[in-house]
């Protein structure tokens, strides 16, 4: 299993989750967990995904997700799980 953490932050609008999940499913990336909240009109989502069977390499997927975020009007970041864990350790 190759896990990654995807974060999405920005103004809430219709279809954010749908657009991100559609991209992931089209490229055979499995969503393992998802947490989403909206606070005062700001959308925040964190996903744990498995990209072991993805049809794109990790770097291409990261770039595509950033471009998708630009299209939607949110910021999308994707990091390998081990990098995310090391960066957020206290």
Curated annotation (Swiss-Prot):
UniProt similarity note: Belongs to the UPF0237 family.
Designated name of the protein: UPF0237 protein BL1209.1
Domain ACT, residue spans: 5-79
Taxonomic source organism: Bifidobacterium longum (strain NCC 2705)
Taxonomic lineage of the native organism: Bacteria, Bacillati, Actinomycetota, Actinomycetes, Bifidobacteriales
Alphabetical list of InterPro entries matching this protein: ACT-like_dom_sf, ACT_dom, UPF0237/GcvR_regulator, UPF0237_ACT
NCBIfam families found in the cross-reference section: PRK00194.1 (NF001220)
Domain of life (superkingdom): Bacteria
